[in-house]
Amino acid sequence: FPLVLWLVPTTTIRKQTVDALKNPRHPYRAALDDAFSGRVRVFDIGDFSQLLPHDLRSNCGVVVGTIQTLRVKDTDGRKVYAHHEMLEPHFTGVPDKMPGLEMIEAGRGAGTIKFSFANLMHLHRPLMIVDEAHKAVTGLSRDMQLRVNPTAIIELTATMRTHSNILHSVSAQELKDEEMIKLSAMPSEHMTW
């Protein structure tokens, strides 16, 4: 089953996305349930310790987090990059020196694989969805992508960059017709400006 890492720009959008994906009546969840025969598990990134190997083997897993949670220069002090014993079952059978995985640098366990959320993502090569991707274009974003090791990246944006590989485009009218525009746009001309 696939694993999806869905990254959004703010905590508010993260909560809204998690709520939508957990709601069986929401169109997003309904589409996932149809595609995977109801075998879908949705997690907030803050609850990554609840991920079990069985969840990832037997279900489509969707982990929703903010871009800022993973996009850092220094990984020290970030929970998603820290060693967590409860993630050990995910690393059973993984070779000791697997390329791309962060290792414990000092102290007990030095030189062994760090049982971290980021390493778990690296192993599973998730599909990465980046909401409002135009806000996520930095060198740090590329570093984060290398750490996570996604199979593919889908960028959702209203502001495409040049040289983007556009798979699908939606007009503002189509969004309005589907009631996906949250604020009404009422442009007016101000002669005093």
Indicate where each model-derived feature is located.
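RecA-like P-loop NTPase motor core of helicase/translocase proteins
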Residues: 1-193
